[in-house]
Every structure is written in structure tokens, then in C-alpha cells.
Amino acid sequence: MRALWIVAVCLIGAEGNLSQFGDMINKKTGIFGIMSYIYYGCYCGWGGKGKPLDATDRCCFVHDCCYGRVNGCDPKMGTYSYSFQNGDIVCGGDDPCLRAVCECDRVAAICFAENMNTYDKKYMLYSLFDCKEESEQC
């Protein structure tokens, strides 16, 4: 448990889009994104395998697929430009790669908000060892 706390603290203070993504999740859902989604289901957090467990986990699966299509920058570390306008997330900036990363995060944050009713605490801190079904293709 101590190791998980250290990871969480490091992520909260992370520069780049991991902290930006957490901010988007917080603004769209009203909950603290990093802690609520970091090890949720089979796809939220680093890595992923098996079939998504619910619609919330599917948001993470789609987000992973989106990151996989980004070329030219590190999706987890680059800092992108975004703003909130009338409750909407608006991605900006001149770098097409970072804008693509922002769009991945924006779509995932909206997906989390639209699927909050599927969020199940039993999938928090879920072990990838329990994700045994064949993985889906993006």
C-alpha cells in the first residue's frame, strides 16, 4: 500500500499531461481523477490487457488506443495547451502531436463523465492478473 501511495504522490506532482489529464477529469466529473482511475479495471493506468470490465474501463481502453495512434511525442509527458470554455474542454496550441494527445485526454474525460454510473469501486486497484480474457483490438 505504501508503494501505491508513493506512485500516487509522484503522479499528482507530475509535469506534463498526466497532471493535465487529471485536471480535465476533475473538471468534467467533479472527482479527483488520478486517484480514482489510476488502477481501475483492466485498462486504466499503465498497460492493459483483456476485455474492459465496464463502460468506465472501456473509456480507458479507447484512451490507450488513442495514445497508440499519436506519433511524434510522448503522450504521457508532453505539456499541451487547453482551456475550459462554458464547461467544454478546448485543446489548442501549434504542435499537432500535443494537440492530438490533448484530444485523447479530452475525449476520455468526457467519456468518464458520461459513464460515471458504471464506476464500480470493486474495480479500483484491480489486478491485471485478473484480466484473463483475450484482449480486444483497437
Curated annotation (Swiss-Prot):
SMART domains: PA2c
Tissue distribution of the protein: Expressed by the venom gland.
Matching InterPro entries: PLipase_A2, PLipase_A2_Asp_AS, PLipase_A2_dom, PLipase_A2_dom_sf, PLipase_A2_His_AS
Record's subcellular location: Secreted
List of residues binding Ca(2+): 43, 45, 47, 64
Disulfide feature: 42-131, 44-60, 59-111, 65-138, 66-104, 73-97, 91-102
Reactions performed catalytically: a 1,2-diacyl-sn-glycero-3-phosphocholine + H2O = a 1-acyl-sn-glycero-3-phosphocholine + a fatty acid + H(+)
GO molecular function, one term: toxin activity
Main location (coarse class): secreted
Stated role: PLA2 catalyzes the calcium-dependent hydrolysis of the 2-acyl groups in 3-sn-phosphoglycerides.
Protein name: Acidic phospholipase A2 PL1
Organism: Vipera renardi
